[in-house]
Amino acid sequence: MEAVIKVISSACKTYCGKISPSKKEIGAMLSLLQKEGLLMSPSDLYSPGSWDPITAALSQRAMVLGKSGELKTWGLVLGALKAAREEQVTSEQAKFWLGLGGGRVSPPGPECIEKPATERRIDKGEEVGETTAQRDAKMAPEKMATPKTVGTSCYQCGTATGCNCATASAPPPPYVGSGLYPSLAGVGEQQGQGGDTPWGAEQPRAEPGHAGLAPGPALTDWARIREELASTGPPVVAMPVVIKTEGPAWTPLEPKLITRLADTVRTKGLRSPITMAEVEALMSSPLLPHDVTNLMRVILGPAPYALWMDAWGVQLQTVIAAATRDPRHPANGQGRGERTNLDRLKGLADGMVGNPQGQAALLRPGELVAITASALQAFREVARLAEPAGPWADITQGPSESFVDFANRLIKAVEGSDLPPSARAPVIIDCFRQKSQPDIQQLIRAAPSTLTTPGEIIKYVLDRQKIAPLTDQGIAAAMSSAIQPLVMAVVNRERDGQTGSGGRARGLCYTCGSPGHYQAQCPKKRKSGNSRERCQLCDGMGHNAKQCRRRDGNQGQRPGKGLSSGSWPVSEQPAVSLAMTMEHKDRPLVRVILTNTGSHPVKQRSVYITALLDSGADITIISEEDWPTDWPVMEAANPQIHGIGGGIPMRKSRDMIEVGVINRDGSLERPLLLFPAVAMVRGSILGRDCLQGLGLRLTNL
């Protein structure tokens, strides 16, 4: 029952596609048919004579009981059985679909389908039981079924049908007993266990002088493969028979796999990872020389095929050299029989030329393994020669290209190069650090030293991109978080040093201007003329505006607004802006974005620079080092900038530039449009024209 269910399920998947019934539904249908007496054995389902009674009975049951599940399942099974029956045009194909693949799911053969029902029921006792037992033995996945004679002479004695040659035990094939292929242990034994049905003419004859050799495995449906390949385009006459070790016998290759591989080579190329994966899957099991050469004719053009033949010959010569040194080499059959040679490995020895059956019978398992491995290695070499990869050293991340796309191009080029596998990972990581965009380079340099593989670097960059964008604003936000604790530590230390036992912040003395004490505690004891005088700047008592200690630090503020006594604010956490970097203690440096708003075509529309806030400069000056070379400039009315060191030549921007200061959270202040000066100075300067337009004061920084 289980074997029949597997056969029917495979046939339904082949001919019904996605709507094929499940094994559970097929088993329920077979159980119902046996219960109703429509089938004496599950294998009777292959007989066309039982199809009409089953259809009528299930239709009547559906109308009476209203249950159409079994009828629907039977409709799909019936369609698959009819399609399989129509496709069997020769007895060799019938054997394949009968299940000679050793448990491989196969549609029914003509011996079970075309046999009349009256002939099956001559003797309802012993004869029917014998037929059922024979069918169950054919469908068993553990054993190979013995095909019936098709009316031809015996290949051993030459007599007509009915000879007893098959009853005698035949010698095992030459490679039986080898530990390389345990699944082939029962191939030769089945020949002597066929009962009264000898091997027919459809089985391949043994070569002269090798009468005891086992016949070759089942062949692929050549006509079907020709049709499949003809519809896809490649000019191929025939296809190889790929033999794999799946189960107790070798089985032919699916034509759809060959068709898909040919299409992949045309669309993806030979170096594609998809192509290599499919070729390795097809050649994962031993192939005959006939199989290998035909497969390469399909996927390679004339020139690559010629290169492959030469490379294959070199690989086979290496195998022969190793087999010559070691008599027990697997290609020599573990010391049994003659040593291997180039003619045997290429399928050119006596009885092998153009004869895949002879190759399957005469070649040893170790030779098949060497042939397949050499062919695959030669294919890899030809793929590198026929389609050379682009130089990985020239790959650079584009301005608008994502890091993932850049990594894909780089890894593909490095893996397709001639670099040894051990050197590919360090090369990829080094290219990440040098060929990526500047923001990503800075992020990778800050990565932990424990990241040692390309995958870890890629994951690190992607994780950081999710947290904050890889721009100057994002980096500014990250740096602000790191600097904030340092600033707070400095503030708290200064505050603790200037705070008395009462906890009040101690400021400058009104009398002497010294820190650390009040006016009442001043040792000079000098009092102002009017101790109750109110200051016009800070709104404090006991001093005037001229004596105010905040006079130099609050120019331009309205009196009495937002001021408090003491030298530090009362708030617990002072406002810290990343616009001022901490590497210059007394120089207010800010991060600025410059955007060219002109219509002149430029390579980079926006740039990021570091500039100095200088209230002593009349105008904004951009250094020649920070100014992009393709941004247009013009001669200014005043060709020089005058300072303490003398005059410096300058030019002026032809286009209007948008200037924006970056805050610590990555946001921008209100931008300003101006025509900055460009000069050869040591650093860019934001002058009073920019400070007034942006509303910036040095006291706020």
From Swiss-Prot:
Zn-finger (CCHC-type) residues: 507-524, 533-550
Biased composition (Basic and acidic residues): 124-141
Motif interval(s): Nuclear/nucleolar localization signal: 524-527
Group of enzyme by EC: hydrolase
Protein name from the UniProt record: Gag polyprotein
Motif position, Nuclear export signal: 219-229
Motif segment (LYPX(n)L motif): 180-184
Region (Disordered): 124-144, 544-571
InterPro entries per UniProt: Aspartic_peptidase_AS, Gag_M, Matrix_HIV/RSV_N, Peptidase_A2_cat, Peptidase_aspartic_dom_sf, Primate_lentivir_Gag_pol-like, Retropepsin-like_cat_dom, Retropepsins
SMART domains: ZnF_C2HC
Annotated motif PPXY motif, positions: 172-175
E.C. code: 3.4.23.-
PROSITE patterns to which the protein is assigned, alphabetical: ASP_PROT_RETROV (PS50175), ASP_PROTEASE (PS00141), ZF_CCHC (PS50158)
Entries under PANTHER family matching the protein: ENDOGENOUS RETROVIRUS GROUP K MEMBER 24 GAG POLYPROTEIN-RELATED (PTHR40389), IGE-BINDING PROTEIN (PTHR40389:SF3)
MF-aspect GO terms: aspartic-type endopeptidase activity; nucleic acid binding; structural constituent of virion; zinc ion binding
Residue ranges of every copy of the Peptidase A2 domain listed in the record: 609-690
Site (Cleavage) residue list: 155-156, 166-167, 177-178, 239-240, 476-477, 479-480, 488-489, 577-578
Site note Involved in capsid protein dimerization upon acidification, residues: 418, 430
GO biological process, one term: viral procapsid maturation
Residues covered by region (Involved in capsid protein dimerization): 217-259, 290-298, 351-362
GO CC field: host cell nucleolus; host cell nucleoplasm; viral capsid
Domain of life according to the entry: Viruses
Xref: Gene3D superfamilies: 1.10.1200.30, Acid Proteases, Human Immunodeficiency Virus Type 1 Capsid Protein, Immunodeficiency lentiviruses, gag gene matrix protein p17, Zinc finger, CCHC-type
CDD domains recorded: HIV_retropepsin_like
